[in-house]
Regions:
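Extracytosolic ligand-binding ectodomains
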Residues: 1-348
Length: 348
C-alpha cells in the first residue's frame, strides 16, 4: 500500500439491494491492494459505500439518491449497481456527471460513454448458450417463463432469436411478476402442451415460486435457467428446489486465477460475486495506475488502457480489460453451465 500523506483516491460503492456482510467490499479491496503492492499507486484507495433499495423491490429514486450522495462525496469512480434495471438508471447519471462507473449486472445495454460493465451473466449471451444446450440434450420443444421486467423481457427476446436460429420450437410462453410467490397457475397453463423442457428467464426471486409450483404439480420436466439461479449462493434454503436444473454461472473449476483466489480468500472464490468483486478491484487498481491525471476523466481513460488481465470468472483463458469503444470487461468463455446437486453448485 502507499505510505505517503497524499489524499486517498475515493471510490464509491453503490449497492442497489441490502448487503449480507462485507464480502464484496473486502474482495474488491483485495484486488486494488494487489495492484498497490506492485508499487504503481502513489496513494491509498478509500471505499465510500452507499446503500439503496433499487428495483425491483425498491425504486428509481433510491438509486438516484445514492448516486447523488456519492457524487457529492467527490468519488472519482463508482462500482455498481448490480441489477440491470438499476444500471440502466445509473448509466445516464454517470454520463451527465462525467463519473466513470463499473456495474456488475447482466445487461450489455447498461454500457455508455462513462459506464463500464463487468458481466455477471449476460441477458444477451446466455440465451444462445441455453438454446445450444437444448440441442445438445435432444430437447426440441420449450415452454418459456420469463420475468415481466426489463431483465426478463430482454432474456426472452434473445432466447426467441436463439431458438429460431437453431430450429427449436416454443410450445408456450408466460410472464411472471419479478417478486411473484406463486407460479402454479402459470405452469398449469404451460404443461398441457407437453414441452420437452421448461426454460426460466428472470432476475431470480420468482425462480423460487417456479420451483415450488413444479413440486406442487408433480411436474418432473427438465429445467434450463439463466444466471438467476446464482441466487442459490445467497439462499441455501432454495437449493433443493433447484435440484437437477441446469443454469448459467460465471465460475468454473478449471480457472487458475480463481484457484489462486481460493487459496487467499476462499469465501470470495466460492461464488460469482466474490470473483467479480476481486476482478473489479484489479481493474480499478490498474485503471488508477494507468491514469495520467487523477480526475474522473483521467480514471475513465485509465480504465480504457487496461488490457489482457486473466479473469477470475469464466473458464480458464477468460480475460478482462476495456477499450475506447469496448466497455465490456470479460472476453472469452465466461459463461459456465452448472447445476445444483445435493446443496452444491456443480459444473456440468
Amino acid at each position: 500500500m502507499a505510505t505517503t500523506t497524499a489524499l486517498p483516491v475515493r471510490i464509491g460503492l453503490l449497492y442497489d439491494f441490502p448487503q449480507m456482510g462485507d464480502l464484496f467490499a473486502k474482495a474488491l479491496q483485495m484486488g486494488v491492494d494487489d495492484v498497490a503492492q506492485t508499487g504503481r499507486l502513489d496513494r491509498d484507495v478509500e471505499l465510500v459505500e452507499r446503500q439503496s433499495r433499487g428495483l425491483p423491490s425498491g425504486s428509481e429514486a433510491e438509486v438516484k439518491r445514492a448516486f447523488a450522495e456519492l457524487d457529492a462525496e467527490d468519488v472519482v469512480a463508482i462500482v455498481g449497481p448490480s441489477i440491470s434495471d438499476n444500471a440502466l438508471i445509473a448509466a445516464p447519471l454517470c454520463d451527465a456527471a462525467r463519473i466513470p462507473a463499473i456495474n456488475y449486472s447482466g445487461g450489455e445495454r447498461t454500457r455508455s460513454q462513462w459506464m463500464f460493465h463487468y458481466q455477471v451473466g449476460s441477458l444477451e449471451e446466455e440465451p444462445p448458450v441455453l438454446a445450444a444446450r437444448m440441442v445438445e440434450r435432444g430437447l426440441r420443444r420449450a415452454a418459456v417463463i420469463f420475468d415481466q421486467s426489463p431483465v426478463g423481457r430482454r432474456y426472452a427476446e434473445c432466447f426467441e432469436a436463439a431458438r429460431a436460429r437453431l430450429g427449436l420450437e416454443v410450445t408456450g410462453t408466460a410472464s411472471i411478476a419479478s417478486l411473484a410467490e406463486d407460479a402454479t397457475e402459470l405452469l398449469g397453463r404451460l404443461r398441457p402442451a407437453e414441452p420437452d423442457v421448461l426454460v426460466y428467464l428472470g432476475l431470480g426471486v420468482s425462480s423460487r415460486a417456479v420451483a415450488l409450483a413444479l413440486a406442487a404439480l408433480g411436474w418432473n420436466v427438465p429445467v434450463l435457467a439463466n444466471s438467476a439461479l446464482m441466487f442459490g449462493y445467497a439462499r441455501p434454503d432454495w437449493r433443493d428446489g433447484y435440484a437437477g436444473w441446469e443454469y448459467i454461472d460465471t465460475i468454473a473449476d478449471d480457472n487458475r486465477s480463481r484457484a489462486h483466489l481460493q487459496e487467499r480468500f476462499p469465501h470470495a472464490a466460492g461464488g460469482p460475486i466474490g470473483c467479480a468483486a476481486y476482478d473489479i478491484g484489479r481493474l480499478l487498481g490498474e485503471g488508477i495506475a494507468a491514469a495520467e491525471h487523477l480526475t474522473r476523466a483521467g480514471i475513465a481513460d485509465g480504465l480504457r488502457r487496461v488490457k489482457q488481465l486473466p479473469a477470475s470468472s469464466g473458464h480458464e483463458g477468460t480475460l478482462i480489460g476495456f477499450g475506447v469503444w469496448d466497455h465490456a470487461a470479460l472476453k472469452g468463455h465466461y459463461l459456465v453451465l452448472r447445476t445444483w446437486r445435493d446443496g452444491h453448485s456443480v459444473q456440468v
